[in-house]
Design a protein with these regions (language model features):
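Long, terminal "pre-/pro-" and other extracytoplasmic accessory regions
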Residues: 2-208
Length: 208
């Protein structure tokens, strides 16, 4: 269970992730960054994958970037107007944030249309301790189903403009792999957040 202080830290991390993911979407929309030729993107509708389907593609690219690359965060979003059925499929484009402990570097790997590539990399001042993914059992469709069943469906019905953000967090201070599912209404400035144990599927409680 999270204390209120730990919960505040998590929310701060998610705000950072949202900024990174917004940058990821901008890069994907503009076709990439960096020197040299930029690979063309598939023409929609492209193949969309769940988190566990997309991860092996991202991991292969990340390990080519740095052999000891480990996943820090996996992120994706569904824009307002997505139906519950679309959410329950749990399939979309993904951004995976990897960290190389030996090189003190991080990179973002995008997976779009079944294609993975590094879109950004750089140094980091501090290397966090990350959990292994061997116990990762709950895929994105299950995480979104849990979100909908724990207030998410009612929240989206009340806030038609809300986007849904889904983040897999692997930092050891969380004690286990955590899915953070967030419905966010920019119009009303409100959010509905459901933290989910990505190993057991249980909703994580917050201690008072």
């Amino acid at each position: 269970m999270f204390s209120k202080r730990e919960w505040a830290i998590l929310i701060g991390l998610v705000v950072l992730v949202l900024v990174v993911y917004a940058g990821l979407l901008l890069v994907m929309t503009r076709g990439g960054i960096g020197a040299g030729a930029v690979a063309s993107q598939p023409t929609p509708p492209w193949e969309v994958l769940t988190a566990q389907e997309a991860y092996p593609l991202a991991e292969e690219v990340a390990r080519a970037w740095q052999p000891d690359a480990k996943l820090s965060i996996a992120s994706s979003s569904w824009r307002s107007g997505a139906t519950p059925q679309e959410l329950l499929e749990g399939k979309t484009t993904w951004g995976f944030h990897f960290i190389s402990p030996s090189a003190s570097q991080s990179c973002i790997v995008s997976v779009v249309g079944g294609e993975a590539r590094v879109i950004e990399s750089g140094s980091i001042p501090k290397v966090p301790v990350l959990l292994e993914l061997s116990d990762w059992q709950v895929d994105s469709p299950q995480a979104l189903s849990i979100f909908l069943d724990h207030g998410g469906r009612d929240f989206l019905a009340a806030h038609a403009d809300a986007d849904v953000h889904l983040h897999l967090l692997t930092r050891i201070e969380n004690e286990t792999l955590i899915w953070l599912a967030i419905g966010l209404s920019s119009k009303d400035g409100v959010a509905h957040t459901v933290p989910i144990n990505a190993v057991t599927g249980a909703v994580v409680e917050i201690q008072s």
